[in-house]
Amino acid sequence: MTEPTGITELLLSRIRDVADYPEPGVVFKDITPLLADPGAFAALTDALAEAAGRTGATKVVGLEARGFILGAPVALRAGLGFIPVRKAGKLPGATLSQAYDLEYGSAEIEVHAEDLTAGDRVLVVDDVLATGGTAEASLELIRRAGAEVAGLAVLMELGFLGGRARLEPALAGAPLEALLTV
């Protein structure tokens, strides 16, 4: 087997397609083989940490749940603080929350009220950009906390779902970086 040469090839070679999951007709992009490969995981972490540096971020927000897996090591590698954005009801103490619409219903995310303040420049990190609903809510939450959005960085963008177009107004000029687009 030939070893992949560039980061794009390396990352793509470690993402497994799972047909008909979680429902028939869906092809799930499973990143667990990438996470299990220390070289690929380190390359991913380095690439996202470089994005944090380019944006001038002072903190990294990770979106529940796989955004935690990627965001925490990115923050550590970049020398920044890590802030988890969780589903409603998962954080103790005072929180700020943001509701957003789903295809069928709504959801809510939260952050500790004291974790983001004026002067913070925040990079949002997640595994996949699909429709952009959760990311859009996180950008609003960051701004409501008084912080500035430095950008959004994801491992993979599912371009056919239109998340980038949805996020353009919410990004307000902040960059959106996807290492892979499928």
UniProtKB/Swiss-Prot annotation:
Protein family according to the UniProt entry: Belongs to the purine/pyrimidine phosphoribosyltransferase family.
Function comment: Catalyzes a salvage reaction resulting in the formation of AMP, that is energically less costly than de novo synthesis.
GO CC terms: cytoplasm
Lineage of source species: Bacteria, Bacillati, Actinomycetota, Actinomycetes, Kitasatosporales
Principal location listed in the UniProt entry: cytoplasm
Entries under InterPro entries matching the protein: Ade_phspho_trans, PRibTrfase_dom, PRTase-like, UPRTase/APRTase
GO terms (BP aspect): adenine salvage; AMP salvage; purine ribonucleoside salvage
EC numbers, comma separated: 2.4.2.7
Molecular function terms, GO-annotated: adenine binding; adenine phosphoribosyltransferase activity; AMP binding
SUPFAM superfamilies (UniProt xref): PRTase-like
Gene giving rise to this polypeptide: apt
One Pfam assignment: Pribosyltran
Pathway(s) served: Purine metabolism; AMP biosynthesis via salvage pathway; AMP from adenine: step 1/1
Protein name, per record: Adenine phosphoribosyltransferase
Location in or out of the cell: Cytoplasm
